[in-house]
């Protein structure tokens, strides 16, 4: 995401594999609840709440913010009691956290994940994990159209669209967690091209979630949060299953070079944002925290999820415009979005990230 945000309920990213250290070693800053996802009655084909309830709440996976400060988040289709059916739901909040409205994303699956506000169209682009589609939603008219649909290019796999970002020309990039691909399309959408893929010549499989022999990887998501550095010379992509950040060089013609592992040891990195100093803010869903990694791959700060939330809360998405974050709690009945107070705090120490599970990558000839 281009703006500074930290968000998502039912989110997945953590640093549980970091070497242990005393909790007081980090200034974790202030965290306040920003908003709470409301209960709603699902609509559309197969609409249902767990336990046959008439209405329910949902975890949320992503969060984005418009230039006027309006905050958007979409339902992920699960809560502590199970899965929801029907269309996904888009929630709209005022800059002060007040719920303005919510409505169904007609045509979608229940499982909406990453989303970005597209200023050129004044629309919200939403990745649909269940259908391999990016939806374009007009939040004023509450209408939905298909922006792009990803094809299957890896045998035995289906598209699993997850996170989105833009380049400086307005092109849209979408991570595919199941096929290990970064898709690209123009500002108006349409048929995407595989900007980065295991099948592209000179590229590799560092974004796939496939385990090495004898390994069990969980959660089984490959390419996840994606973001360019400020100079647009590299795109960083998180591999949740491998606890890693992959750095993909951007060539002068805008094409992708060969990705390399930038750092590893993050326990389920999920959401990603890049600040003005090229620090990477990673939502860590197994450690219930936001971890800040500097341009050299060192952890320089941590932001904790609100202590008011149970330890089962999960942090998934990141977005930097307002220093907000969202978190899901499986132990409770609500899905809060939390506000993280910036600027980046000074830390008592920094440390390198130890290695996590390694991948023997294969580069396409």
Regions found by a protein language model. Give the residues of each.
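Beta-propeller fold detector
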Residues: 30-39, 100-105, 145-151, 192-206, ...
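Blade-level signature of beta-propeller repeat domains, shared across WD40, Kelch, NHL, RCC1
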Residues: 325-365
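Sec/Tat signal peptide C-region and signal peptidase I cleavage site
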Residues: 20-25
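Bacterial N-terminal signal peptides
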Residues: 8-18
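Short loop/turn segments that connect beta-strands within beta-propeller blades
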Residues: 93-98, 138-142, 186-190, 249-254, ...
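Short glycine/acidic-enriched loop and turn motifs that connect beta-strands
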Residues: 77-82, 131-133, 179-181, 242-244, ...
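Residue position within the beta-strands of beta-propeller blades
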Residues: 71-74, 126-127, 174, 237, ...
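Beta-rich, blade/repeat-based domains predominating
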Residues: 43-47, 52-68, 85-87, 106-124, ...
């Amino acid at each position: 995401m281009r703006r500074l945000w930290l968000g998502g309920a039912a989110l997945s990213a953590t640093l549980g594999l970091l070497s242990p250290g005393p909790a007081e070693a980090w200034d974790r800053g202030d965290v306040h609840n920003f908003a709470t996802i409301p209960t709603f009655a699902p609509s559309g084909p197969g609409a249902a709440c767990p336990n046959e309830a008439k209405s329910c709440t949902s975890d949320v996976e992503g969060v984005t913010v418009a230039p006027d400060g309006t905050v958007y988040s979409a339902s992920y289709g699960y809560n502590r009691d199970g899965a929801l059916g029907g269309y996904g739901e888009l929630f709209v909040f005022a800059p002060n956290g007040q719920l303005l409205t919510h409505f169904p994303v007609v045509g979608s699956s229940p499982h909406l994940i990453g989303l970005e506000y597209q200023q050129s169209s004044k629309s919200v682009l939403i990745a649909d994990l269940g259908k391999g589609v990016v939806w374009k939603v007009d939040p004023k008219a509450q209408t939905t159209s298909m922006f792009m649909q990803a094809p299957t290019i890896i045998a035995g796999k289906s598209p699993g669209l997850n996170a989105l970002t833009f380049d400086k020309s307005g092109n849209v990039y979408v991570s595919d967690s199941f096929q290990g691909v970064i898709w690209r399309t123009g500002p108006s959408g349409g048929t995407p091209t595989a900007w980065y893929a295991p099948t592209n010549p000179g590229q590799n499989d560092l974004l796939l979630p496939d385990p090495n022999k004898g390994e069990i990887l969980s959660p089984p998501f490959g390419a996840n949060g994606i973001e360019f550095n400020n100079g647009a010379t590299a795109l960083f992509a998180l591999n949740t299953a491998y606890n890693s950040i992959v750095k993909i060089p951007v060539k002068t013609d805008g094409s992708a070079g060969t990705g390399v592992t930038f750092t590893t040891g993050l326990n389920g990195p999920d959401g990603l944002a890049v600040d003005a100093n090229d620090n990477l803010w990673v939502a860590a869903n197994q450690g219930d925290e936001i971890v800040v990694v500097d341009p050299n791959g060192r952890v320089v700060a941590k932001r904790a999820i609100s202590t008011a939330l149970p330890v089962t809360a999960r942090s998934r998405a990141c977005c930097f415009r307002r220093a907000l974050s969202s978190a899901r709690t499986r132990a409770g009945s609500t899905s809060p979005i939390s506000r993280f107070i910036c600027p980046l705090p000074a830390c008592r120490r920094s440390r390198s990230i130890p290695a996590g599970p390694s991948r023997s990558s294969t580069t396409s000839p």
